[in-house]
Regions:
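Membrane-interface junctions at transmembrane-helix termini in multi-pass inner-membrane proteins
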Residues: 10, 137-163, 186, 353-385, ...
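N-terminal membrane topogenesis motif
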Residues: 1-28, 81-89, 124-126, 203, ...
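Interfacial segments at transmembrane-helix termini and the short loops linking adjacent helices
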Residues: 112-133, 325-357, 430
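Helix-loop junctions and terminal segments of transmembrane helices
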Residues: 32, 61-77, 148, 152-153, ...
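Interfacial/gating helices of multi-pass transporter permease domains
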Residues: 33-55, 86, 189-190, 224-231, ...
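Membrane-proximal transmembrane or re-entrant/amphipathic helices at the cytosolic face
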Residues: 432-433, 456-512
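Transmembrane helical elements of multi-pass membrane transporters/channels
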Residues: 11-31, 191-203, 207, 222-292, ...
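Interhelical loop/hinge segments that connect adjacent transmembrane helices in multipass membrane
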Residues: 1-9, 186-187, 203-247, 289, ...
């Protein structure tokens, strides 16, 4: 990895971490205010509408991801004409997508009540609220959304993150004040499209300032169109699997169990997403750099980097999983003021931790799938995960409720995400045996389980309640697993390579 790629990754990581901190803390405050000022049914509605709109966003078909992938090469060789043509193409596509989302969203209006089992607040017009959420989604496509793709391909995700940090901070603060002072959910929701407009206008301004030579004009060649079409078909199924995994669960719980259960599930999922978001932030900051590396360096070099990055990330994943196991229930108990009716069982909590480990273990591998453009080759895997998750979630959810929904998600991730996608990556890009990669993962899993059992047992002996107990358990979670990991890995080749890489990043060596 060249010095420029390290520099870009470090810059993107710094801004992304700031954004992630904002995305964790401020929404938590807003979420808490909704629960305490309005009630769990309002939080359930928020989760349901958000999930529905994420499903509608499948209309994107993955054009942005496909175009960003195609942009890597012309950007690397300085072909601005092709870059401008691709941006112009994406601009036209986004306008069409916005129209389609609006049309489908309006068609769904009469069916909203069938997605809610039981009651919802009498004073709420669910159709009006839904239309506000829908307008927010449509605006995000119509107003300069294509400029975000340009900044990402240019390895300047730090710019979009800085804008998002400012806009989201402002929005969450305004929403919190509105909820605290007025307790009005309509006023809270109306700020979503308002701040989306401001965000997209700022992205346009910054993009024009940093890359004035890139304007949407020209036409792409037929060969590029064919390549985009091929990639989009694969990316769409990838998006389908991700959306089904992240949103179908909420819709299934709402339709089979009710809004209160959605609120409880989403409280745990919010914590899950916050920690997963941190892990995703770290890996996503490397995406453009990995894509550039795949475009300019050999397969063997990239394979060695995959093994090295997987080791580093597995250590991080293990730490996060152990922290979740030990701190999930104590934190929710403090958050919900000891109300056990708003808490999941310990078994479901452990399922959430398992869910976190299996999905986060795929993060580094996903960088190489995206960077090598294997979306088309993985179309069947994506489709099977999506279809499997939908079917299993409804079947197991019907019989076992939230437990069944979580089990369905874990099963489909292991079968069609971890195992299936690994096989395709090694067969189509690395073209070598996957044995070494799986041996590493088995070792990392075994060490994580031992670590987790030991740390959880020690934490269970701490009977101090409240924030003091949380802090003590957090210190235990940060010390014992790291010490055991260091003991196990210190003399291994993986540790030495990882340490050398981390050291080179911080002292800005030219090569790793």
């Amino acid at each position: 990895m060249s010095d420029s790629r390290i520099k870009n990754s470090k810059r993107n990581l710094k801004s992304a971490i700031i954004l992630q901190i904002i995305n964790i803390i401020l929404p938590f405050v807003v979420r808490t205010l909704i629960l305490y000022k309005l009630g769990e049914e309002y939080q359930g509605l928020n989760g349901l509408f958000t999930s529905i709109l994420q499903v509608l966003n499948l209309t994107d078909l993955g054009f942005s991801s496909a175009v960003v992938y195609i942009l890597y090469k012309p950007i690397a060789i300085g072909d601005n004409d092709t870059v401008c043509a691709l941006i112009s193409y994406l601009k036209r596509v986004y306008r069409i997508i916005g129209i389609v989302i609006l049309a489908i969203g309006l068609i769904l209006l009469p069916f909203l009540k069938f997605l809610i089992k039981g009651s919802y607040p009498d004073e709420v017009n669910i159709y009006l609220l839904y239309l506000i959420y829908l307008s927010n989604s449509v605006i995000s496509y119509w107003l300069f959304a294509y400029k975000t793709a340009l900044l990402l391909a240019m390895q300047r995700a730090d710019l979009t993150d800085k804008i998002s940090s400012i806009i989201k901070s402002s929005m969450f603060i305004v929403q919190a004040v509105v909820l605290f002072v007025f307790g009005n959910y309509y006023v809270y929701v109306i700020f979503l499209p308002i701040f989306s407009i401001i965000n997209n206008l700022l992205v346009q301004f910054v993009s024009k300032k940093y890359f004035p030579q890139i304007t949407p004009h020209g036409k792409i060649s037929e060969n590029i169109k064919k390549e985009i079409t091929k990639q989009v078909k694969g990316v769409f199924f990838n998006k389908l699997s991700n959306v089904c995994r992240n949103t179908i669960d909420t819709i299934v719980i709402s339709s089979l169990v009710g809004l209160t259960s959605v609120a409880i599930y989403n409280n745990y999922f919010y914590i899950f997403t916050a920690i997963y978001g941190v892990s995703l932030t770290v890996s996503n900051c490397m995406q453009a750099s990995v894509g550039n590396s795949i475009a300019t360096e050999g397969v063997e070099r990239n394979y060695k980097n995959l093994i090295k990055f997987t080791f580093i990330f597995s250590w991080f994943t293990s730490m996060c999983t152990i922290c979740l196991c030990c701190l999930y229930q104590p934190f929710v108990k403090v958050w919900m003021s000891g109300n056990k009716n708003l808490m999941l069982s310990d078994f479901n909590m452990f399922l959430f931790c398992t869910y976190f480990y299996v999905i986060t273990s795929c993060n580094i591998r996903n960088l190489y799938i995206s960077g090598s453009g294997l979306f088309w080759e993985l179309r069947l895997s994506y489709f099977m995960e999506a279809a499997g998750n939908i079917i299993l979630s409804f079947v197991l959810g019907y019989y076992f409720g939230v437990t069944g929904v979580l089990l369905a998600t874990i099963i489909t991730i292991v079968l069609f995400n971890f195992l299936s996608r690994n096989r395709v990556l090694f067969k189509s890009y690395f073209q070598r045996t996957i044995k070494e990669y799986y041996i590493d993962h088995v070792l990392y899993l075994f060490v994580t389980i031992v670590n987790c059992i030991l740390t959880y047992t020690i934490c269970s002996l701490i009977h101090i309640e409240g924030m003091a107990g949380l802090i003590i358990k957090l210190l235990i979670c940060l010390s014992i697993p790291n010490a055991l990991n260091l003991l196990v890995y210190f003399k291994t080749k993986r540790f030495k390579e990882a340490f050398k890489f981390i050291k080179s990043v911080f002292i800005r060596k030219n090569k790793i």
